[in-house]
Curated annotation (Swiss-Prot):
Record: active site: 237, 266, 285
Catalytic activity: glycolate + NADP(+) = glyoxylate + NADPH + H(+); (R)-glycerate + NAD(+) = 3-hydroxypyruvate + NADH + H(+); (R)-glycerate + NADP(+) = 3-hydroxypyruvate + NADPH + H(+)
Family: Belongs to the D-isomer specific 2-hydroxyacid dehydrogenase family. GhrB subfamily.
E.C. no: 1.1.1.79, 1.1.1.81
GO MF annotation, one: glyoxylate reductase (NADPH) activity
Protein name (database record): Glyoxylate/hydroxypyruvate reductase B
Pfam families: 2-Hacid_dh, 2-Hacid_dh_C
GO CC annotation: cytosol; plasma membrane
Role this protein plays: Catalyzes the NADPH-dependent reduction of glyoxylate and hydroxypyruvate into glycolate and glycerate, respectively.
Gene symbol of the encoding locus: ghrB
Keyword Cytoplasm: yes
Length: 324
């Protein structure tokens, strides 16, 4: 008899068929309590769980006593109580490598769009304001040869440093938990403490996961240390930034502009002051959102679950100790 799994994400037919070749699949729209109650027997017997964006917590796990592996279609997993999974010897799989280049493209796009005011001036053209040769009121600032500060030198940070160094001749500073020799050798990146990075960088790009240590790592003190000409980019997790402090820094001219792919609350409230600022480029968490990469992420998550339920967790496992 095939193992049974719960699927809470719509997959392309070919990937669904791949799952069905290995498992008995129960598809549900979400992991809300009423959904779990409606499919109580399927949840109780499921050995695998596959999807994204829903909360996976102790309350859910109590309804899934047979669960052995969970696979998220994402690199981040702050919506999952990893400690609770580990305590129950449930492995968590994620999709870190397949989205690296696409997210780095998004970060670079935010840097360019914000510095060159692409969104702002495009909207002015559409509004009929381009009636004569443009003057300084339409100008942005250069990106090439400016100093880039990367906070979080993981895979995405490395891909961003590559683009900045080779494509835009940007000096690269970085701050991370540990030195990254490859970044220093390949991109002449300079490791520094966070305060130094904030004081020297023209672009501060945050690519951090959300942890107890990184929550509100960026607040009023950090924005005050940045150049008034600095551009702040957040493509990690929204709660890494105190959004009220960011709004105040933008309103007070402490920093020049911001490009944001993530927010403290998502979707972003229509009442957010950020939406009324011409020096803010705000996009709806599109970091990995291309057709190609989202498909590859789903395929990776499917393969991860198949591997995990066969005892193969050599790659893409968040908590390998759970299998011990």
């Amino acid at each position: 008899m095939k193992p049974s799994i719960i699927l809470y994400k719509t997959l392309p037919d070919d990937l669904l068929h791949r799952l069905e070749a290995h498992f008995t699949v129960t598809q549900v729209p979400n992991l809300h309590p009423e959904t779990v109650a409606r499919h109580a027997q399927a949840f109780a017997s499921a050995q695998g769980l596959l999807g994204t964006s829903e909360t996976v917590n102790r309350a859910l796990l109590e309804k899934m006593p047979a669960l052995r592996a969970a696979s998220t279609i994402s690199v981040g997993y702050d919506n999952v109580e990893v400690d609770a999974l580990t305590a129950r010897k449930i492995v968590l799989m994620h999709t870190p490598a397949v989205l690296t280049e696409t997210v780095a493209d998004t970060v670079m796009a935010l840097m360019l769009a914000t510095a060159r005011r692409v969104v702002d001036v495009a909207e002015r053209v559409k509004a009929g304001e381009w009636t004569e040769s443009i003057g300084p009121a339409w100008f942005g600032v250069d990106v090439h040869h400016k100093t880039l500060g990367i906070v979080g030198m993981g895979r995405i940070g490395m891909a961003l440093a590559q683009r900045a160094h080779f494509g835009f001749t940007m000096p690269v500073l970085y701050h991370a938990r540990r030195r990254h020799q490859e970044a220093e050798d390949r991109f002449n990146a300079r490791y520094c403490d966070l305060d130094t990075l904030l004081q020297e960088a023209d672009f501060v790009c945050v690519i951090l996961p959300l942890t107890a240590e990184t929550r509100h790592l960026f607040g009023a003190t950090q924005f005050a240390r940045m150049k008034s000409s600095a551009i702040f980019i957040n493509a990690g997790r929204g709660p890494v930034v105190d959004e009220n402090a960011l709004i105040a820094a933008l309103q007070n001219g402490e920093i020049y502009a911001a490009g944001l792919d993530v927010f403290e609350q998502e979707p972003l409230s229509v009442d957010s002051p950020l939406l009324n600022m011409s020096n803010v480029v705000a996009v709806p968490h599109i970091g990995s959102a291309t057709h190609e990469t989202r498909y590859n992420m789903m395929a990776c998550a499917v393969d991860n679950l198949i591997d995990a339920l066969q005892g193969k967790i050599e790659k893409n496992c968040v908590n390998p100790q759970a299998a011990g």
